[in-house]
């Protein structure tokens, strides 16, 4: 029983471990590599039956503590359901999630990080420790170059440079060098950061030559700035055919018959070593010649030719450049070749003396019918104009520095002549019009041998109803010429005859004479109606624009072109045969933007809160490329498209707008267009409520003010009756009342008129003296007698501003003139007043 207890405990622990592991599945690289100061990217995925991950801890070199039943070790990172606790170094990042991604990043990584990384995962029902090996070196470890099993010259191969490192936070590059020099071929670099592998790979494709054999290829690891980190080198083993060169004795490879020649085949390079040797002459293998040296004893002229050596190895045969061996000998019996035989009378004939010799013959002797031809010592005899007496047998003898040859059989010269006095005759009556049927015949005087055929030129799909007769159906236009030839062994051509076909004008086109560049509005423009040819030459011209007749001259001139002159132009040219029209030519006039206007959608009155679109419409060629918008203060708006969209539109947007359009020719601007934004019912309701309340408050205050004013006036009136009255003066100023402007454009301008000035109206009222008391005043007449020195008058004046604006043609913006009224009131007492003339004085003072 005591022995059974530990075994049962072990079985239970194994079962628990197995059941726990069955709930977790991880995928990641087994080992990751890096170096001091770099970073490590750990791609990782996991799968857990219980997806509710509660905590994640990253240990460095974890060890299981049996006493605490937990893992001990340096905690690089810890994440719980309550939140993340960053590491002290803040260099470890958990890039995964609580579902299936457990990717990690350590940046920077240090040498002491080498060892095991433990990923401790805990859920509600299970726990797991996943281990990952990390190898961090003190210095960047070198990449590894992978070569194909075999490299042959001129065959494309792929060199692979592999580095077991890749990290998003630490960029690197792999550089290829050949003998320390960067290779010109472009390499393809790829990286892998997957759960299967982490690496950086560079692949280089190039075609090595035999000269690359034994050269050093380097793959250099560099950082992002190109700084050297590490490298790997390999020596190329390029398999190639033997490379050969022939050395000849004598060096110029020129010998006389009976002398000896030695040729040596030198192998400059071969990989692998060569196995067989052979010699070739003029491409044919020489028997029993399988050494690097070829000896030719007592050579003959037949041994002259091109020699090369061929050496083979396991890759294939290598062949040297050819060496031409010249064996010199005296001329052999000569033969004569007659060029251009049989010869035509009047033509040139050339005789060639052919004799095999090395070196070539330097002197020749010619014979005609067995008689030596004096002065003929060249290889060729040229007779510029052959005559019948030149016929006969020709032979020759050749001579070089080694001796004189023998005269061989001669060559016979046969002198013949082509048909004589050949002519082409037109059978039709003249003149010939385009489309007519024309018949021609070919005649000649004599021929040796007899004429067997006729030729015509130019060639065409024409009929030959009989030998020497040509019929042309539907003859074409132009000054066509026809010539015929009567042929036996050779052809004699007649002089060409012109058909002189009459036709309507051809190739009519419109050509712009000026300006040579683009046509701008206002330019002087000339159009020329051109045609290539016409027969007869007397022609007339007609110009049309869009189907409308313009003129009858060859040139159409515009002193100052306008956009309205643009259109499709064509011209007509006619003669007595017919007329021809040109293709339509489009006259395009470039002009700056014009007729600009601002259109408003849905209209120039918009309720606030809605959208308003202002469109800058224009007429321009080329089309407007840039738009600028301005408000009523001529301030440019930050909008440069054709449409200005206000959404939502506000009351503050009310005002005048204008736009400016620009193209490559110039610019133009529109007049002002006013946009009115009125309040929405909601805003009006709010403002009416506020206004009504304000008016009610003002009304109450006004009523109170009127009552106080009346009480004050009553008090002042009583005081005035008690006091000795005297003249009172006061001014009353009428305030301006603004009125809406008339329907004048916002852009209207006026001119100031200094003569239209303000005025002062002045009036004095004088009253006659009277002692007649008014009804009810008898009892108080004495008391109210005025002082003798008082002048009973009322003075009234008005400072009057005329109803006009500051400018003559601008209507003022107010409905009434602003005036200052001045009055002086004299209180009259009761009693006698001195006699005075009743009058009214009125004065206007202008200032």
Swiss-Prot record:
PROSITE patterns in the cross-refs: IG_LIKE
Pfam annotation, one family: Ig_3
Description of post-translational modifications: Phosphorylation of Tyr-762, Tyr-807 and Tyr-822 are involved in binding to SYK, GRB2 and SYK, respectively. Phosphorylation of Tyr-842 is involved in binding to SYK, PLCG2 and PIK3R1/PIK3R2.
GO cellular component: early endosome; external side of plasma membrane; neuronal cell body membrane; recycling endosome
Residue ranges annotated as Extracellular topological domain: 20-687
Transmembrane intervals: 688-708
ITIM motif 1, short sequence motif: residues: 760-765
GO biological-process terms attached to the record: B cell activation; cell adhesion; negative regulation of B cell receptor signaling pathway; negative regulation of calcium-mediated signaling; negative regulation of immunoglobulin production; regulation of B cell proliferation; regulation of endocytosis
Start and end residues of each Ig-like C2-type domain: 143-235, 242-326, 331-416, 419-500, 505-582, 593-676
Residues spanned by motif ITIM motif 3: 820-825
Principal location: membrane
GO terms assigned for molecular function: carbohydrate binding; CD4 receptor binding; protein phosphatase binding; sialic acid binding
Protein localization: Cell membrane
Residues with glycosylation annotation: 67, 101, 112, 135, 164, 231, 363, 428, 445, 448, 479, 574, 634
Modified residues (Phosphotyrosine): 762, 807, 822, 842
Annotated signal sequence range: 1-19
Cytoplasmic compartment segments: 709-847
Role noted for this protein: Most highly expressed siglec (sialic acid-binding immunoglobulin-like lectin) on B-cells that plays a role in various aspects of B-cell biology including differentiation, antigen presentation, and trafficking to bone marrow. Binds to alpha 2,6-linked sialic acid residues of surface molecules such as CD22 itself, CD45 and IgM in a cis configuration. Can also bind to ligands on other cells as an adhesion molecule in a trans configuration.
Quaternary structure, from the entry: Predominantly monomer of isoform CD22-beta. Also found as heterodimer of isoform CD22-beta and a shorter isoform. Interacts with PTPN6/SHP-1, LYN, SYK, PIK3R1/PIK3R2 and PLCG1 upon phosphorylation. Interacts with GRB2, INPP5D and SHC1 upon phosphorylation. May form a complex with INPP5D/SHIP, GRB2 and SHC1.
This protein's domain notes: Contains 4 copies of a cytoplasmic motif that is referred to as the immunoreceptor tyrosine-based inhibitor motif (ITIM). This motif is involved in modulation of cellular responses. The phosphorylated ITIM motif can bind the SH2 domain of several SH2-containing phosphatases.
Family designation: Belongs to the immunoglobulin superfamily. SIGLEC (sialic acid binding Ig-like lectin) family.
Name of the molecule in the record: B-cell receptor CD22
Organism in which the protein naturally occurs: Pan troglodytes
Primary gene name: CD22
């Amino acid at each position: 029983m005591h022995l059974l207890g530990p075994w049962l405990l072990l079985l239970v622990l194994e079962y628990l471990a197995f059941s726990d592991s069955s709930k977790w599945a991880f995928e990641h690289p087994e080992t990751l590599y890096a170096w001091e100061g770099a970073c490590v990217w750990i791609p990782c995925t996991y799968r857990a039956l219980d997806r509710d991950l509660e905590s994640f801890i990253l240990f460095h070199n974890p060890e299981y503590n049996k006493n605490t039943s937990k893992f001990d070790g340096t905690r690089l990172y810890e994440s719980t359901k309550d939140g993340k606790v960053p590491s002290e170094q803040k260099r470890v990042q958990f890039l995964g999630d609580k579902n299936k991604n457990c990717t990690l990043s350590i940046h920077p990584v240090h040498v002491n990080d080498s060892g095991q990384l433990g990923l401790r995962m805990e859920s509600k029902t299970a726990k797991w420790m996943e281990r990952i090996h990390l190898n961090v070196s003190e210095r960047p470890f070198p990449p590894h170059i992978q070569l194909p099993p075999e490299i042959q010259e001129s065959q494309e191969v792929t060199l692979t440079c592999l580095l077991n490192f890749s990290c998003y936070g630490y960029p690197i590059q792999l550089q290829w060098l050949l003998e320390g020099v960067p290779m010109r071929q472009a390499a393809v670099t790829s990286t892998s950061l997957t759960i299967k592998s982490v690496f950086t790979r560079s692949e280089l494709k190039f075609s090595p030559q035999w000269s690359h054999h034994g050269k050093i290829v380097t793959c250099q690891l560099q950082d992002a700035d190109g700084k050297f980190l590490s490298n790997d080198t390999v020596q190329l083993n390029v398999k190639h055919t033997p490379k050969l060169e022939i050395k000849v004795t004598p060096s110029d490879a020129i010998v006389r018959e009976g002398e000896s020649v030695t040729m040596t085949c030198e192998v400059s390079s071969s990989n692998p070593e060569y196995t067989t040797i052979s010699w070739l002459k003029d491409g044919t293998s020489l028997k029993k010649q399988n050494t690097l040296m070829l000896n030719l004893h007592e050579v003959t002229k037949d041994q002259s030719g091109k020699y090369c050596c061929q050496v083979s190895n396991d890759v294939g045969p290598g062949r040297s450049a050819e060496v031409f061996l010249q064996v010199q000998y005296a001329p052999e019996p000569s033969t004569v070749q007659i060029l251009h035989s049989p010869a035509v009378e009047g033509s040139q004939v050339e005789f060639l003396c052919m004799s095999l010799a090395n070196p070539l013959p330097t002197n020749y002797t010619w014979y005609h019918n067995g008689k030596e031809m004096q002065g003929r010592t060249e290889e060729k005899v040229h007779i510029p104009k052959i005559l019948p007496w030149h016929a006969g047998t020709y032979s020759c003898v050749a001579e070089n520095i080694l001796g004189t040859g023998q005269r061989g059989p001669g060559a016979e010269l046969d002198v013949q002549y082509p048909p004589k006095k050949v002519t082409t005759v037109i059978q039709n009556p003249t003149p010939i019009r385009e489309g007519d049927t024309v018949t021609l015949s070919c005649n000649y005087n004599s021929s040796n041998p007899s004429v067997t055929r006729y030729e015509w030129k130019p060639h065409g799909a024409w009929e030959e109803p009989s030998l020497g007769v040509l019929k042309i159906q539907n003859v074409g236009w132009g000054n066509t010429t026809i010539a015929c030839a009567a042929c036996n062994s050779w052809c004699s051509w007649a002089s060409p005859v012109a058909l002189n076909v009459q036709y309507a004008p051809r190739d009519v086109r419109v050509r712009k004479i000026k300006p040579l560049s683009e046509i701008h509005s206002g330019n002087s423009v000339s159009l020329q109606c051109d045609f290539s040819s016409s027969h007869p030459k007397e022609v007339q011209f007609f110009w049309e624009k869009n189907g409308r007749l313009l003129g009858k001259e060859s040139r159409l001139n515009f002193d100052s072109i306008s956009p309205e002159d643009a259109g499709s132009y064509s011209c007509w040219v006619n003669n007595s045969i017919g007329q021809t029209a040109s293709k339509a030519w489009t006259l395009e006039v470039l002009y700056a933007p014009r007729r600009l206007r601002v259109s408003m959608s849905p209209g120039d009155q918009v309720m606030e809160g809605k959208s308003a679109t202002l469109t800058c419409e224009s007429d321009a060629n080329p089309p407007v490329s840039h738009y600028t918008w301005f408000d009523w203060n001529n301030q440019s708006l930050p909008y440069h498209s054709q449409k200005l969209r206000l959404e939502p539109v506000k009351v503050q947007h009310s005002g005048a707008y204008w736009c400016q359009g620009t193209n490559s020719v110039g610019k133009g601007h529109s007049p002002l267009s006013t946009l009115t934004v009125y309040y929405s019912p909601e805003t009006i309701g709010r403002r009416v409520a506020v206004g009504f309340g304000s008016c009610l408050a003002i009304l109450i205050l006004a009523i109170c003010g009127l009552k106080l004013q009346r009480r004050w006036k009553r008090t002042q009136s009583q005081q005035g009756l008690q006091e000795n009255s005297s003249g009172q003066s006061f001014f009353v100023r009428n305030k301006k009342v603004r009125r809406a402007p008339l329907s004048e454009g916002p852009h209207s301008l006026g001119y100031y008129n200094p003569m239209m000035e303000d005025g002062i109206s002045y009036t004095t009222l004088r009253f006659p003296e009277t002692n007649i008391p008014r009804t009810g005043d008898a009892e108080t007449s004495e008391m109210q007698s005025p002082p003798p020195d008082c002048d009973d008058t009322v003075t009234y004046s008005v400072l009057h501003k005329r109803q006009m604006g500051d400018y003559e043609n601008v209507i003022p913006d107010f409905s009434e003139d602003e005036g200052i009224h001045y009055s002086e009131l004299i209180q009259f007492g009761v009693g006698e007043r001195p006699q005075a003339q009743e009058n009214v004085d009125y004065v206007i003072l202008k200032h």
